């Protein structure tokens, strides 16, 4: 799952909070070019199972999320579905 945020600083804050609270590893990564619409080029990558926890963590820590995508593979190509 990719969580798009406004800046690398915000991505780092979300990553640290997520790892501390849910225990899943989270990574600050470059946003895939298919998702980057001229905005921040960094997002947080975390396990899809953490969706509800990520939303709660972001809300509790006043971290604005621009969009959340789930990645899947269709016919050998990556496809991104908008979650929110």
Locate each region found by the language model.
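Short cationic amphipathic helices and targeting signals
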Residues: 1-4, 41-46
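Short, conserved beta-strand edge motifs with alternating hydrophobic and charged residues
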Residues: 4-6, 27-28
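Helix N-cap motif at beta-to-alpha junctions
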Residues: 7-11, 46-51
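Short amphipathic alpha-helix segments
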Residues: 8-25
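Short, glycine/acidic-enriched capping/hinge loops at junctions between secondary-structure elements
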Residues: 15-16, 39, 55-57
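Short hydrophobic/aromatic-enriched beta-strand-loop microsegments
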Residues: 24-29, 65-68
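Amphipathic, hydrophobic secondary-structure cores in small proteins
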Residues: 26-44
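C-terminal structural segments of small proteins and small subunits
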Residues: 48-84
């Amino acid at each position: 799952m990719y969580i798009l945020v406004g800046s690398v600083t915000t991505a780092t804050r979300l990553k640290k909070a997520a790892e501390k609270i849910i225990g899943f590893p989270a990574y600050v990564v470059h946003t895939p070019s298919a998702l980057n619409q001229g905005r921040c080029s960094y997002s947080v990558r975390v396990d899809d199972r953490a969706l509800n926890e990520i939303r709660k963590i972001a809300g509790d820590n006043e971290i604005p999320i621009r969009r959340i995508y789930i990645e899947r593979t269709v016919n050998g190509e990556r496809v991104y579905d908008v979650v929110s």
